[in-house]
Amino acid sequence: MSRPPRLTASDFDPEVLDLFDRYVHGQIDRRGFLSGAAGLLAALTPQFAAAQQVKPDDARLKTSFVEFASPDGYGKARGYLVRPAKARRLLPAVLVIHENRGLNPHIEDIARRLGLAGYIAFAPDALFPLGGYPGDEDAARALFQKLDATKTRQDILAAARMLRTLEGGNGRLGAVGFCWGGGMTNFVATQVPELLAAAPFYGAAPPAEDVAKIRAELLVVLADNDERINAGWPAYEAALKAAGTHYTTFRPPGTQHGFNNDTTPRYDERAAHDAWSRLLALFERTLRKGHRASPG
């Protein structure tokens, strides 16, 4: 029987190590240690209400939950649709792909932020076939493990196709995704040649053999301290260069995986602000004006 890998200090948050040190040196007892650990866990729990930037009933927006067909996926899928309330012209659309928690309040807020920026935003819920986002992050994480990955990918592609022909849209399509959604954004870029722009935030790279299929311009956002995702970046970048894909990268120093998520302690305000500004600049140029940059 093999031994589990030995963990080192770098595997733990400094606050956890400080708490453990105080326990080892008798400054707190076991009960105090467990109580403190529980407090840390509570502190790490997403604070959706506190981080909300755009209220669900903001009068400047029209929001609704929309079901759509996904014949190659689970058959039927559902997502959160946001559009400016008083649009005077046809608008570009943005597919918003959530983390591995489903369509939680944070991702709905991201969609509303894009709505206020003048886009039609649509955030599909990968967990819809299993009842949808359950309202609890731990339960959502557990549900994610039960999804059929092939069907889920097809649901996301069906959402992209639906957006291209949505009433009120001008046919121009972009995508942004975070964590699991970042990897899914990379996948969508390899499968939807009509996609004009994509911004995968700390997402897994697509298979190298599929990179040449990408026609969208990419903004690849990486966290500085993200060993798992960053390990795949050199090969992904080499494939992008070989294919002549238009791309830029943004890797703000000192950031953690999930730094854009303003509901958790991993949030880095300055880095998130800069990443969002770059995202909006990409969409403004490619989706609204139809311009492309030079290859990366």
Predicted regions mapped to residue ranges:
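Primarily recognizes the serine-hydrolase "nucleophile elbow" in alpha/beta-hydrolase
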Residues: 158-215
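N-terminal secretory signal peptides
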Residues: 1-28
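Gly/Ser-rich "nucleophile elbow"/oxyanion-hole loop immediately N-terminal to the catalytic nucleophile
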Residues: 137-176, 291
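Short beta-strand element of the alpha/beta-hydrolase
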Residues: 90-98
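N-terminal secretory signal peptides and thylakoid transit peptides that target proteins
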Residues: 18-44
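Cap/lid segment of the alpha/beta-hydrolase catalytic domain
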Residues: 127-150, 258-263
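Short beta-strand/loop motif that positions the catalytic acidic residue
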Residues: 220-222
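N-terminal cap/lid segment of alpha/beta-hydrolase-fold proteins
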Residues: 52-86
